[in-house]
Amino acid sequence: MEEFQVYLELDRFRQHDFLYPLIFREYIYALAHDHSLNINNRSGLLENVSSANKYKYSSVIVKRFIFRMYQQNHLIISANDSNQKQFFGHNNNLYYEMISAVFAVIAEIPFSLRLVSSLKGKGPAKSHNLQSIHSIFPFLEDTFSHLNYVLDVLIPYPIHLETLVQTLRYWIKDTSSLHLLRFCLYEYCNWNWKSLITQKKSILNPRLFLFLYNSHVCEYESIFFFLRNQSSHLRSTSFGVLLERILFYGKIEHLIKVFVNDFQDILWLVKDPFMHYIRYQGKSILASKDTPLLMNKWKYYFVSLWQCHFYVWSQSRRVRIKQLSKDYLDFLGYFSSLRFNPLVVRSQMLENSFLIDNAIKKFDTKIPIIPMIGSLAKARFCNALGHPISKPAWADSADSDIIDRFVRICRNLSHYYSGSSKKKNLYRIKYILRLSCVKTLARKHKSTVRTFLKRVGSGFLEEFFTEEEEVLSLIFPRAYSASRKLYRGHIWYLDIICINDLVNHE
């Protein structure tokens, strides 16, 4: 962000909290377009073509578009006439794409500046390690063995567009930018809020709506974190008055004053050091060592907060209480639970010896094979029963491109599921992808699988599907046996910043 500070003229705009003038800068559109391309190439998606690739716009189109934005009458276009009207040979969806992409870049500027200023004076921050999704699991391994219950929360999405705009009012003081955002949302877009959470293809600009959704979630989390720090055990009698005050004041800064000054006597201040909160996308988990009664109170609090403060109707089944020793937790593409490992210790005192049976809790992660087969079947790599099939959509590509696609998917899944305690399901997924690749190549050459393998050899694909065990043997050449033992355990990588579509099965 510092290298673009002068280029974006942020100092002059930040003095008055004005972001709206940046919409009329040509280089902002170039930055937004380049960022969309980088995200699409880095995510490793299967067949999802981002909107940045759909609409190729040049600098000439950007200049004409900015010129027409100065003319307010030409900017206002009815959504009902979007199919009939054309803009210099392009569909009006290009308008929506350009505005949404630019606003996503501009809206993130205040938060990026806050992050840069907060990191000053703290030394070099290794943020690339903290960005990895796998960095969560070592934390879960260390903490979950001491916890009992988990609240599995499915965060509801806002039912009205104005809710998202009102949330940004607390952080962005530029009224013109908020009016432009409201104008685009109401006039141009018919958004499916469920697709907002699952990132379906129907979203015109996922980055913008993920930013809006995260802003909405951040507001409710700010209230939750304050209450969690002030009081972990809320009495049931305080919920009614508490939510009335939340509804009355509305803003978080007013909430803090009210809670500290007026409600200190009715909050039961009992700290719970074993409470942990984790969120990713539209799901969050609240793990604690509390009793089922207290976990039910937190469940009631979540539902009441969404309904009374955010006007979101949330059913109680969206918040489920799970016991770690009995139930599996579906989070980040893994089935996680606590497994008891029996341990027998022989103790001898003088002439007497006796055995001591101990049960050690161990954090266990498994691959959800049934949802994974469903994702592979949806992507047409296999049928509903898990039998591999050919990929007709890729049969027209070159052999090297077909193999490269399958290899990339296979390695990404193997890389992500390296933390599984049992690799049997991972081998099954690799088998499906490997045989699907062979069937796709055989379909292209109009032959059977057996005939194709006889012609190219049975070891044709072995060099492309490098096992993680072979990679570890290259890293630890002097301790190959130790690397094999390491491979059987959990391996968490610190370079995974996004989830493949196949893993994100919903």
Swiss-Prot record:
Gene Ontology molecular-function annotations: RNA binding
One Pfam assignment: MatK_N
Sorted UniProt keywords: Chloroplast, mRNA processing, Plastid, RNA-binding, tRNA processing
One GO biological process term: RNA splicing
GO cellular component assignments: chloroplast
Reported function: Usually encoded in the trnK tRNA gene intron. Probably assists in splicing its own and other chloroplast group II introns.
Protein name: Maturase K
Originating organism: Carica papaya
Lineage: Eukaryota, Viridiplantae, Streptophyta, Embryophyta, Tracheophyta
Gene that encodes it: matK
